Amino acid sequence: MESIEQQLTELRTTLRHHEYLYHVMDAPEIPDAEYDRLMRELRELEAQHPDLITPDSPSQRVGAAPLAAFSQIRHEVPMLSLDNVFDEESFLAFNKRVQDRLKSGDKLTWCCELKLDGLAVSILYENGVLISAATRGDGTTGEDITSNVRTIRAIPLKLRGDNIPARLEVRGEVFLPQAGFEKINEEARRTGNKVFANPRNAAAGSLRQLDPRITAKRPLTFFCYGVGILEGGELPDTHLGRLLQFKAWGLPVSDRVTLCDSPEAVLDFYHKVEEDRPTLGFDIDGVVIKVNSMALQEQLGFVARAPRWAVAFKFPAQEQMTFVRDVEFQVGRTGAITPVARLEPVHVAGVLVSNATLHNADEIERLGLRIGDKVVIRRAGDVIPQVVNVVLSERPEETRPVEFPTHCPVCGSDVERVEGEAVARCTGGLICGAQRKESLKHFVSRRAMDVDGMGDKIIDQLVEKEYVHTPADLFRLTAGKLTGLDRMGPKSAQNVVNALEKAKETTFARFLYALGIREVGEATAAGLAAYFGTLEALEAASIDELQKVPDVGIVVATHVFNFFAEESNRDVIGQLLAEGIHWPAPIVVNADEIDSPFAGKTIVLTGSLSLMSRDDAKARLVALGAKVAGSVSKKTDLVIAGEAAGSKLAKAQELGIDVIDEAEMLRLLGV
């Protein structure tokens, strides 16, 4: 008997620990499925030994104590939780228990709802006015979150319509839609603040802020699903009828609530919701099934912590625990280096998962992850599995830190991470095998080297057949080699060779753009070319010197500097020049000596030009002593607006900057 008592003590201690983390700290350490498993184990053991049940056992209550920082509200009607089922057999057994208890052959009608993954709240209205709001807490006493709830736009401060009870306590779930969750985390990453592991944690953390102004900035919403106190009024005699009445009074109710007149219909509802789950826009972890008749609900009553007339039918767990065996680093097509956790395989949401993304070095630091750790893995819908958190309380003794590479694991080039950016990148854009296809496609594109007839499919084949490794290899191709590609005859092959020969004559700006330096678009490339004049001067420029170019800040300057600092990139540039790529020598323009309305002015082009290409317009303006910038600022002297000009035009008008159209530009150019 002693060993059974010890088992019970350990189970209760473990459950209390995780209840505290979940309800009080808003930092759950294990998946819900693992908590449910521990609770089932405790209940089964207590059922076998009822004399060992204690009043403070987690099986006898709902949750954990509320935070001391909030004042407390006592629930006049306890806020109980629901029992769970996890498969069709268990649901059908629940259905039979209800039928047997009612001792009636009549068919039951079930009201089925979504099981929202948020925070349960109670909201009290007196004469239709919101008086107070509280969390579930331990089911008997919750935290007073009235000030925070009043900031949630979905929750009416005053009910609308007629026949509103004198006192009405509605219950529901506060949750955070997926889009809002992503926005909060994006802002947190930008400002270096805490990133939430999932929408449920974000909703709880937002609702339980001591400063309501913070809550007001979070896009929380709410669905109503039940009632607690009802005084001085009446409600319909069915659960669905009550929800519809709440909706008429202005309370939000999910539009997925459905009546089912048989267990088979309930199962159909369950599977349909499971199928739609990835597209809902918010997290759910199952469906809730309730007897629709309020009279039958009353007849069925309650057990210690849950009603007999309702059950939560949970979906297969989207979170499971496993171990990180190693961390490897993948290089994407843009050079982004992503750490990937190699896991001890585990089934998550019906799929065997052996890898999970770790995003970047900041995420590894946030998690405090070490190789060998026990972790929680989450897989939702088609989302790539990710590590949610480390189970620190079960960290093995032999773990080791994750070391982020300083050199690209594919090509060996230096890895850069610009200040203010989370992603580390390979700087060997011209030689890196992982980036090869994308960098070559960019190099030959119309606005870059403009190699006519060399499309994406040709590049794909050239790389796959290992005919081409760097941009310089393109100019060594022969018609004979090209005929080895699919659907490439002798004539087409010769046309491509001719196009490559023609492309050798370009401009300095186009060449810079073709190199694919990160953050260097056409406008920035033109600015760099105009400012430095020669490739040699640009290659020798420091970060400070690069920032003297209009519209070039610290981030772009760092990318340019790191690109030219990488020896492999300089080698490829040397090979390109040796293959005959050239451009006209720069014409030094002194704006003071030019008689032109554009001389010495900083100009921005926006919208579509119909009579002249944007490149030609830029070239003519620069030749007349203008500086062409990519964005509008107080330093801008003139904006030339083509068709469908957008935000740049609006900003120019806001700043009072002169604006002319394409026709006026052509007139001033003398075209």
UniProtKB/Swiss-Prot annotation:
One cellular-component annotation, GO: cytosol
Binding site for Zn(2+): 408, 411, 426, 432
Catalytic residues as annotated in Swiss-Prot or TrEMBL: 115 (n6-amp-lysine intermediate)
Cofactor annotation: Mg(2+); Mn(2+)
GO biological process: DNA repair; DNA replication
The keyword Isomerase is assigned to this record: no
GO molecular function: DNA binding; DNA ligase (NAD+) activity; metal ion binding
UniProt KW keywords: DNA damage, DNA repair, DNA replication, Ligase, Magnesium, Manganese, Metal-binding, NAD, Zinc
Substrates-to-products reaction catalysed: NAD(+) + (deoxyribonucleotide)n-3'-hydroxyl + 5'-phospho-(deoxyribonucleotide)m = (deoxyribonucleotide)n+m + AMP + beta-nicotinamide D-nucleotide
Domain BRCT: 593-671
Pfam families in alphabetical order: BRCT, DNA_ligase_aden, DNA_ligase_OB, DNA_ligase_ZBD, HHH_2, HHH_5, Nlig-Ia
Gene3D superfamilies: 5' to 3' exonuclease, C-terminal subdomain, 6.20.10.30, BRCT domain, DNA ligase/mRNA capping enzyme, Helix hairpin bin, Nucleic acid-binding proteins
EC annotation from Swiss-Prot or TrEMBL: 6.5.1.2
Class of the enzyme per the UniProt entry, highest EC level: ligase
Amino acids binding NAD(+): 32-36, 81-82, 113, 136, 173, 290, 314
InterPro entries hit by this protein: BRCT_dom, BRCT_dom_sf, DisA/LigA_HHH, DNA_ligase, DNA_ligase_AS, DNA_ligase_CS, DNAligase_adenylation, DNAligase_N
Keyword Manganese: yes
Function: DNA ligase that catalyzes the formation of phosphodiester linkages between 5'-phosphoryl and 3'-hydroxyl groups in double-stranded DNA using NAD as a coenzyme and as the energy source for the reaction. It is essential for DNA replication and repair of damaged DNA.
HAMAP family per the UniProt record, alphabetical: DNA_ligase_A (MF_01588)
Family of the protein in this entry: Belongs to the NAD-dependent DNA ligase family. LigA subfamily.
Name of the protein described by the UniProt record: DNA ligase
Species per Swiss-Prot/TrEMBL record: Citrobacter koseri (strain ATCC BAA-895 / CDC 4225-83 / SGSC4696)
Gene: ligA
